[in-house]
Amino acid sequence: EQEEQRQKNAHRLKAAAEREAIFIAEREAAERKRREEEKERQRREAEIRNLPTTLYACVSSWNSHINSTLKHKYFFNYYSYYTHKNDATSSMWDTWKTVWNFKNDPSKNISSYEHTTALNKVIDLVEGELRRTFGSKTEYLTLVCLTASTQRKTELRFKKFAEIVCKDLKMNNAYPYIRVAGEGGAMHEGGTGVTSKSYDSSFFKGKYIVLFDDVRTSGNSLERERRILENYGAKVICAITIAQTVRDY
């Protein structure tokens, strides 16, 4: 009986020691996790504090234009179709078709296949550029697509594009927070480029903005959008367009 009792005591002591060891290990693991989470929290806080500096630094090598401090990236030169349609190069035609098919204007009889092909091409270009430029910092950015001349055209042109890019890059999507109230016309097609729009101004406060449009001509539309958003408390970091109009002099 004494031997049996001794073994029971030994077993209890061993079990108690094992429970204590498990408790200590779990406590140490919890402490390590807490320290790691605190370290990550401090890193993110520092990263967020430095965003105004680091995000602008990311685009320091992008294009600058006369009379504008807005950094701009584009992928193709856009020549006037009406000037060059009879002597256009294959590159000009490729750019025209990419822009036209992306814009998906309901009056132009663009097929679903043509639009989807152009959409995927532009998404790949834009996402690739943003990843290379900002890395994981895309999560701090908000994508603002400049509106077309009507709400319907804006939806056909930008809604799906914005949804996909923002989902893939974990960006904020500003598309639902801007609506067209009046009509204008595209500048590179002879319009004024001015539309009447309504903004959910509270959404933009403190946001870091990437502007997007299909074609930049004079840059006035981008600058106008920049001023509006900055008046709402946003910081406009840069602009991306599919193409840049090349003037013939």
Q: What positions do the PLM features span?
A:
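A short, conserved beta-to-alpha structural element at the edge of catalytic cores
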Residues: 226-249
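Substrate-recognition/cap helix-loop segment adjacent to the acidic, metal-dependent catalytic center
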Residues: 153-172
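Residues at the starts of beta-strands that form the adenosine-phosphate
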Residues: 174, 208, 235-238
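Long, low-complexity, compositionally biased polyampholytic IDRs enriched for Lys/Glu and Gln/Arg
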Residues: 1-46
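A phosphate-binding catalytic loop at a beta-strand-loop-alpha-helix junction
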Residues: 211-225
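Active-site-facing substrate-recognition patch
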Residues: 44-139, 178-208, 218, 243-247
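Short glycine-rich phosphate-binding loop at a beta-alpha junction
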Residues: 138-149
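Short acidic, S/G/P-rich loop/turn micro-motifs used as interaction or catalytic elements
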Residues: 105-106, 150-152
